[in-house]
Curated annotation (Swiss-Prot):
Top-tier EC class: transferase
Protein name: Sphingosine N-acyltransferase-like protein FUM17
Effect of deleting the gene: Does not affect the production of fumonisins B1, B2 and B3. Double knockout of FUM17 and FUM18 does not reduce resistance to FB1.
GO molecular function: sphingosine N-acyltransferase activity
One GO CC annotation: membrane
Pathway: Mycotoxin biosynthesis
Family: Belongs to the sphingosine N-acyltransferase family.
Membrane topology annotation: Multi-pass membrane protein
Record-annotated TLC domain positions: 151-368
Residues spanning the membrane: 60-80, 113-133, 166-186, 204-224, 241-261, 339-359
C-alpha cells in the first residue's frame, strides 16, 4: 500500500562533483602549503647565508694565520725535505747570477708555475696583516682621535692600511726602477730595448710577485664584501679585473719593465689619495694641503706619465727592440701583444679619468664650498656631512 520513500534521491554526477570539490580544496591547500614551504626554505637559506657570511667576517683571519705560521715553520724545521713548502715562501727557479757592471754577483730567476704558490702564500699573509693592522693598531688610533661612528672607523682603517702598504711599496718600487737599466724616471725606451726580459733579479721578481699578491688579496676583499661597497663599486671591480689581467699577462709574456712603471704610477698616487682621505676622517688641519698634493700627484702620475707610456706602446713598442712572434724563443712583442697592451692600458686610463673627475669635483667643494667629502663613498646615516 505504501511506497518506500527516501530522504534524498541520488543524482547522477553528484558524487563525482563532490570528489572534484574536495580534490580542488586539497590541491589548493597543498599549493598554499608548498608556497609557504618554499618561502620558509628561502628565508632559511637567507638566514643560513647571513650566518655563514657573519662567521666569515668574524674569522676571516683564521686561515691566513694558519698558513702564514705553519708553512714557514715546516720549512724552517726541514728546509731540504720541505722543498715543496719552500716554493710558497721563497723565490723559485734560480738559475745562476750576473756580474755585468755590478760590484758583486746578483742572482737571476726565471718564471714558472711555482710562482703562483708564492703569490697565494703572500696574499694570505697580506690578508692577515690587513686584519691585524686594522683591528689592533688602526681602530685604537681612530678611537683616540674621536672617530666615533662605526662607518667612519671602518673607512679610516681601510684608507690607513692602504696608505701603510703603499708607503712601503712606493719607495721599494722606486728602488727597483732605479736599479733597473733604462727605466729611471719613467724612461720608456728601456721598456723595450732589452726585451724579452725572461730572467729577473731577486728585487724585481719579489716586488712584482708581492704586488700581484696584494691585488689578489684586494680582489678577495672585494668579492667577499669585507669592505662596504662604494658608489663606484662597478668601476672598482673593472679596475681590479684589468689590474690582475695586466699583471698576469705582463709577467707571463715578459713585459715586466712596463709593469714596474705602471705599478709605481698607481702606488704613489694611491699613497697620496689614501693619506688625504685618512686626514679627512681625522678632521686634521693638513687635510686641505694633502688633498691638493693628491690631485697634483694623480694628474702627473696617472695621466701625464700614463699617457707617455700609452704613446710609447703606439710608437716605441714596434720600433725599439725585436718585433715578432716567436713562441720557441719566447718572443711575444708583436702586433697582437701591442693591441692587447694598448687596449688594457687605455681601459685603465678611462677609469682614471672617471676618478679624476670625482677628484676635481671634490677639490671644488673643498676649496670653494668648504665641504670635505668624497662623493665616491657611501655615507652612513649617522655620519655628519664631512664624513666619507
Amino acid at each position: 500500500m505504501f511506497k518506500a520513500t527516501t530522504s534524498a534521491r541520488h543524482r547522477p554526477g553528484q558524487g563525482n562533483s563532490l570528489s572534484t570539490l574536495m580534490a580542488r580544496y586539497n590541491n589548493q591547500g597543498l599549493q598554499r602549503y608548498s608556497l609557504k614551504d618554499k618561502e620558509h626554505k628561502i628565508r632559511r637559506r637567507k638566514r643560513s647565508w647571513g650566518f655563514q657570511h657573519s662567521v666569515i667576517l668574524k674569522n676571516s683571519w683564521a686561515l691566513p694565520l694558519l698558513l702564514t705560521i705553519v708553512l714557514p715553520v715546516i720549512y724552517a724545521i726541514h728546509p731540504v725535505e720541505s722543498k715543496f713548502f719552500g716554493h710558497f715562501i721563497l723565490l723559485s727557479y734560480r738559475h745562476g747570477s750576473v756580474t755585468d757592471g755590478m760590484a758583486f754577483p746578483v742572482a737571476q730567476y726565471k718564471k714558472g708555475l711555482w710562482d703562483l704558490a708564492f703569490v697565494a702564500f703572500y696574499a694570505n699573509a697580506l690578508f692577515l696583516a690587513r686584519k691585524f693592522i686594522m683591528k689592533r693598531l688602526l681602530r685604537p688610533l681612530a678611537l683616540k682621535n674621536n672617530v666615533s661612528t662605526m662607518g667612519k672607523q671602518q673607512r679610516f682603517m681601510e684608507q690607513m692600511y692602504t696608505a701603510c702598504y703603499f708607503a712601503v711599496m712606493g719607495p721599494f718600487g722606486l728602488y727597483v726602477m732605479k736599479t733597473t737599466p733604462g727605466l729611471w724616471i719613467f724612461q720608456t725606451h728601456g721598456m723595450y730595448d732589452s726585451y724579452p726580459h725572461r730572467s729577473l733579479g731577486p728585487a724585481i721578481k719579489f716586488y712584482y710577485l708581492l704586488q700581484a699578491a696584494y691585488w689578489v688579496q684586494q680582489s678577495v676583499v672585494l668579492v667577499l664584501r669585507l669592505e662596504k661597497p662604494r658608489k663606484d663599486h662597478m668601476e672598482l671591480t673593472v679596475h681590479h679585473i684589468i689590474t690582475i689581467t695586466l699583471i698576469a699577462l705582463s709577467y707571463r709574456f715578459h713585459f715586466t719593465h712596463i709593469g714596474i712603471s705602471m705599478y709605481i704610477t698607481h702606488d704613489i698616487s694611491d699613497l697620496f689619495l689614501a693619506t688625504s682621505k685618512s686626514l679627512n676622517y681625522l678632521s686634521h688641519r693638513l687635510q686641505t694641503p694633502a688633498f691638493c698634493l693628491c690631485v697634483i700627484a694623480w694628474i702627473y702620475l696617472r695621466h701625464y706619465t700614463n699617457w707617455r707610456i700609452l704613446y710609447s706602446v703606439l710608437t716605441e713598442f714596434r720600433t725599439v727592440g725585436p718585433f715578432e712572434l716567436d713562441w720557441e724563443a719566447e718572443q711575444y712583442k708583436c702586433q697582437l701583444s701591442q693591441f692587447i697592451t694598448f687596449g688594457l692600458l687605455a681601459t685603465l686610463q678611462t677609469l682614471n679619468i672617471i676618478w679624476l673627475y670625482c677628484l676635481l669635483r671634490n677639490a671644488y667643494r673643498l676649496l670653494f664650498l668648504r665641504i670635505a667629502k668624497d662623493d665616491r663613498s657611501d655615507t652612513d646615516k649617522s655620519e655628519i656631512e664631512h664624513g666619507d
